[in-house]
UniProtKB/Swiss-Prot annotation:
One of its GO terms (biological process) is proton motive force-driven ATP synthesis. Its main location: mitochondrion. GO terms for molecular function: lipid binding; proton transmembrane transporter activity. It comes from the Eukaryota. It is found in: Mitochondrion inner membrane. The gene is ATP9. The record marks E57 as: Reversibly protonated during proton transport. Keywords: CF(0), Hydrogen ion transport, Ion transport, Lipid-binding, Membrane, Mitochondrion, Mitochondrion inner membrane, Transmembrane, Transmembrane helix, Transport. This is ATP synthase subunit 9, mitochondrial. The keyword Transit peptide does not apply. It is a multi-pass membrane protein.
Amino acid sequence: MLAAAKYIGSGVAALGLIGAGIGVGIVFAALIQGVSRNPSLRGQLFTYAILGFALSEATGLFALMVSFLLLYS
């Protein structure tokens, strides 16, 4: 019974990765849209996009870490 609860909890915690994937998609969609509107700002927009990517991916990695902690503890 405890093993089943660990697997269910780990799966539910891993659902946070869905949000990270959506966030990364939104960040790079905004980058493509911004560069298509104003190509001269490509360098500055790319810097902001990488920062947004890192922040949204960090939340996904935290969710993955919690999932692994629930699974292997």
